[in-house]
């Protein structure tokens, strides 16, 4: 198998009370697992695709045969998006950024509160299923954007630094139709050390 589902880096209940254990278990063990399984099935007969990283797959969809391109776009996107999602959260999350990303957010958006409001607004306004992101754009600046379905910012040449899943499966058991409430609660579980690591890598081009 080319791709594997990594275990969650913390217990299912580690993000309580903001994200419940049942949601985490279903989200990781069922939804994310399905993306990995579907991706592996799609590339089973393409050994060259199996040797690519998931990031390379979504960055270079033009290299993917047309008969499996949409399946790879959806499921490789789901895999790379969720892998980041788990890693940028943690049991000892903090609501306020630390380190270099804090200064960069202030410089780009005026303040953390202004950034948070713009980020939450973008997530609230994403129609249907999708994601909201902070990215290093192709031009090198920080931008907030949202993508539909499981599309990764990598498809458009942007480097994701952090992202929140606004598919209903990410929050519906606890928040039902109250997506803005979920978006606001999510800030309490962020692992800013990991986000800083991704920020440094994005800004240095790695």
Swiss-Prot record:
Induction notes from the record: By methyl viologen, and under conditions of iron or nitrogen stress.
InterPro entries: Mn/Fe_SOD, Mn/Fe_SOD_BS, Mn/Fe_SOD_C, Mn/Fe_SOD_N, Mn/Fe_SOD_N_sf, SOD_C_sf
Cofactor: Mn(2+)
The record's free-text note on cofactor binding: Binds 1 Mn(2+) ion per subunit.
Pfam family, one: Sod_Fe_C
UniProt binding sites for Mn(2+): 27, 82, 165, 169
EC supergroup of this enzyme: oxidoreductase
EC number: 1.15.1.1
Family statement drawn from the similarity comment of this UniProt entry: Belongs to the iron/manganese superoxide dismutase family.
Role description: Destroys superoxide anion radicals which are normally produced within the cells and which are toxic to biological systems.
Record-given protein name: Superoxide dismutase [Mn] 2
Organism: Leptolyngbya boryana (Plectonema boryanum)
């Amino acid at each position: 198998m080319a791709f594997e589902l990594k275990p969650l880096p913390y217990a299912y209940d580690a993000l309580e009370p903001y994200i419940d254990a049942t949601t985490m278990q279903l989200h990781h063990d069922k939804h994310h697992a399905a993306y990995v399984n579907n991706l592996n099935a799609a590339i089973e007969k393409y050994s060259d695709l199996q040797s690519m990283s998931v990031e390379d797959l979504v960055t270079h969809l033009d290299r993917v045969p047309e008969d499996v391109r949409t399946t790879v776009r959806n499921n490789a996107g789901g895999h790379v998006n969720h892998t980041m999602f788990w890693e940028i959260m943690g049991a000892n999350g903090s609501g306020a950024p630390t380190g270099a990303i804090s200064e960069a957010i202030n410089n780009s958006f005026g303040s953390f509160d202004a950034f948070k409001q713009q980020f939450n607004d973008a997530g609230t306004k994403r129609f249907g299923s999708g994601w909201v992101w902070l990215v290093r754009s192709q031009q090198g600046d920080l931008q907030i954007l949202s993508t539909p379905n499981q599309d990764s910012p990598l498809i458009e040449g942007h480097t994701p630094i952090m992202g929140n899943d606004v598919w209903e499966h990410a929050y519906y058991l606890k928040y039902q139709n109250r997506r803005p409430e979920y978006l606001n609660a999510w800030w309490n579980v962020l692992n800013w050390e990991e986000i800083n690591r991704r920020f440094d890598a994005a800004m240095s081009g790695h």
